[in-house]
Amino acid sequence: MHFSPALKSGKLLKRYKRFLADIQLEDGTEITLHCPNTGSMRNCLFPGETVWFSTSNNPKRKYAHTWELMTTPTGGLIGIHSGNANALVEEALNKGVITELVGYDSLSREVKYGDENSRIDILLEAAQKPACYIEVKSCTLLEDGQGYFPDAVSLRGQKHLRELMHMASLGHRAVLLFVVQHTDIHSVAPAAHIDPEYANLLKKAVLSGVEVLAYRCEISASEIHLAHACPVRV
């Protein structure tokens, strides 16, 4: 995924009201960005460090600028736009990057499934193969060298694990795919210290036949894409 037009940068001042962030440009001007991340963004906020943002030419938008990347104090980069995760996975699937998920003929997005009124992020289908239901989660929380998900209690995430277990019980292929949008994260684990119920459900899901994958992103100010598989420590 290329950032076009090119991203611009500023220094983070603060994030507030969940969906807003104030930054300061090089000339001292302060502007407000839309923050496209509904999570807590725990350990992803570094006031004074460089942020990268995109700009929309849609005159109907209240906030023309969208926060895309955060630079860490060690020089790493974090993909702030959690909504990019599904598009990154679709792009990677089309290129055959996710080797565990090759060999399917069709890809659909946001298809209704399960028994809790859910929509699957990605559905892969092929003749003479079980359908493959993929839930995509963006992982950005880094603590003591370990990547974790979720970064806050996630009832929605718990529901999705139950849905995946249900699909696996019906004979379908069920996959939980973590998209690691943090260049300093090299493995992913459930955040039992934040959401113990999610961690317990994930263990049950694996025992029920749900596959758990994680892929790291390569991130720069010009592009972001899925690149390499990394371990998941369930």
Swiss-Prot record:
Q: What's the protein name?
A: Sugar fermentation stimulation protein homolog
What's one GO MF term for it? DNA binding
Q: Which Gene3D superfamilies match?
A: 2.40.50.580, 3.40.1350.60
Gene name of the encoded protein: sfsA
In which domain of life is the source organism classified? Bacteria
**Stated family:** Belongs to the SfsA family.
Xref: Pfam families: SfsA (PF03749), SfsA_N (PF17746)
Q: Which organism is it from?
A: Shewanella sp. (strain ANA-3)
